[in-house]
Regions:
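Secondary-structure junction/capping motif
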Residues: 43-44, 113
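C-terminal lobe/tail of nucleotide-utilizing enzymes
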Residues: 75-147
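Short hydrophobic alpha-helical runs that function as membrane-insertion/retention elements
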Residues: 56-59, 116
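ATP-dependent carboxylate-amine ligase catalytic core
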Residues: 1-43, 50, 62-71, 75, ...
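Short glycine-/polar-rich loops that comprise or flank the Walker A/P-loop
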Residues: 52-55, 83-84
């Protein structure tokens, strides 16, 4: 919005979400860059999550330094009293933390479940990804069981 010199009306975003939620069993809201991404000057993604009373899943990378980033995000979510379901690891690089160690460390530091990891692939193929998604992510406990 800032680059386009526009002001976003948050009330319209909330109204649109409420309308969508009234007609759909599930509405997935993407975090547009992270929990502290500004939507407007004094309104952040974490404020929107709170105002919409959403549960969250934190998606983290697997590169070195990711635990620091993840913990800063987690601590902010705790400060804002956001409802956190757990974590997903996006292995967007071929190097970095060994996955099982990272998952164990995340659980040990936060006590929250790591639902799985999206593996790194040299050549990304959306059809293959969608087909294999259930092998990567355990969606039990996310609230989709009765849909």
């Amino acid at each position: 919005c800032k680059q386009l010199n526009l002001e976003l009306d948050i009330s319209k975003v909330i109204e649109s979400y409420t309308q969508l939620a009234s007609i759909h069993d599930v509405v997935i809201v993407e975090g547009i860059g992270g929990i502290m991404t500004p939507i407007s000057k004094n309104y952040f993604v974490s404020d929107l999550i709170s105002d919409l009373q959403l549960s969250s899943i934190i998606v983290t990378g697997s590169k070195i330094g990711t635990v620091n980033h993840l913990m800063l995000t987690y601590e902010h979510a705790q400060q804002k009293k956001l409802k956190l379901k757990g974590f997903v690891v996006n292995q967007n690089i071929s190097t970095g933390y060994e996955l099982s160690n990272l998952k164990h460390q995340i659980f040990g530091l936060t006590g929250h479940k790591v639902f799985g990891a999206i593996p790194y692939h040299e050549s990304f193929n959306i059809e293959s990804y969608v087909e294999n998604f259930p092998n990567f992510i355990d969606i039990s406990g996310l609230g989709f069981e009765n849909i």
